[in-house]
């Protein structure tokens, strides 16, 4: 198995992506000879224009785990349709016991979101949004619930195509 070298200072990629680390957990594997310590990292990567990806990485050292998570997040990026720095419409995302409600907001509102959700919207480029989380506050489940809700969001063009109308009729 190939070893991934930890990222050293100044070894920044010039791909224009924003990276945020959400959580690092210390994990322990108990074996016959004692305990083996490791680390698990949860990160999000975005381009500031609606693309977002989540990654998890595990390793014996924190920098290696974070780098693995960042690489996975880059590979799993999805495009979310934004409208003037906010969402198209209200959406609800669920994962496990975590339920996340996201509502578009007017200019000047800012990002009203807690914990892991704030990191997602900052790297994604959302500037005005109001969110509320219900149930589980586990960072992994909150991130997955947020991404679930963002994947459910549809553009006015998609809604118009489903209804057999023009975009102007949908927007009123």
Curated annotation (Swiss-Prot):
Residues 17-80 form the S5 DRBM domain. Belongs to the universal ribosomal protein uS5 family. The keyword Cell membrane does not apply. This is Small ribosomal subunit protein uS5. GO terms for cellular component: small ribosomal subunit. With S4 and S12 plays an important role in translational accuracy. One of its GO terms (molecular function) is rRNA binding. Gene3D superfamilies: 3.30.160.20, 3.30.230.10. Part of the 30S ribosomal subunit. Contacts proteins S4 and S8. Keywords: Ribonucleoprotein, Ribosomal protein, RNA-binding, rRNA-binding. The keyword RNA-binding applies. GO terms for biological process: translation. PANTHER family: MITOCHONDRIAL RIBOSOMAL PROTEIN S5. The N-terminal domain interacts with the head of the 30S subunit; the C-terminal domain interacts with the body and contacts protein S4. The interaction surface between S4 and S5 is involved in control of translational fidelity. The lineage of its organism: Bacteria, Pseudomonadati, Pseudomonadota, Betaproteobacteria, Burkholderiales. SUPFAM superfamilies: dsRNA-binding domain-like, Ribosomal protein S5 domain 2-like.
